[in-house]
Amino acid sequence: MGKRLGALTKDNTKCMIKVNGVTLIDRLLIQLSSLQLSRVVIVVGYKGDKLREYIGNRYPDLHIQYVYNTVYNKTNNIYSLYLAKEYFVEDDTLLIESDLIFDDALFHKIVDNSYPNLALVAKYETWMDGTMVRLDEDD
C-alpha cells in the first residue's frame, strides 16, 4: 500500500524493498537479533501473509509474534499500535517502523540508556510531511 513507492510495493510491503541488496525487514531483524530481546511483535496489514511467509524461520533466535490489522486500508500506524497494546504492558518496548533504516549502534544506545522513556526523532527538514515533534528548552 505504499502509494508513493508505486511499483516497488505493488506486490510487497514497504519493508520488503531491497536497499543495497538487503530487504529493510531483514536489516531490521538482523539488528534486533543482536539485542537479545525476549520477543519481537510485528503488526502486519497489506501483504501481511506474504511478509510472514518471507520471514518464516529465518531468525530462530528471535521469538516473533504477529498481530494482524485487517483494516489496514482504512487505518493508520496508531491503530496498528492499538492492536498490539497488550504486548506493551508486559515488557519494555521498542516501537520501530519497519520501512526506516537505522545505524546498528543506535539500537544498542537505546537499550543501554538509563532513561525510563526515550523517543528518537529526526531533525525537521522542509521536505518532511507527517507527524512532527516540537521540543523546547525543557525537552
Regions found by a protein language model. Name each.
Residues 91-101:
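Short beta-strand-to-loop acidic/aromatic patch adjacent to the donor-nucleotide binding site
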Residues 44, 97, 121:
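Short beta-strand/turn micro-motifs composed of small residues
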Residues 22-93:
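Conserved N-terminal catalytic core of the sugar/cofactor nucleotidyltransferase
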Residues 103-139:
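Conserved core of the sugar-phosphate nucleotidyltransferase
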Residues 10-27:
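Short catalytic helix/loop segments, enriched in acidic residues and glycine
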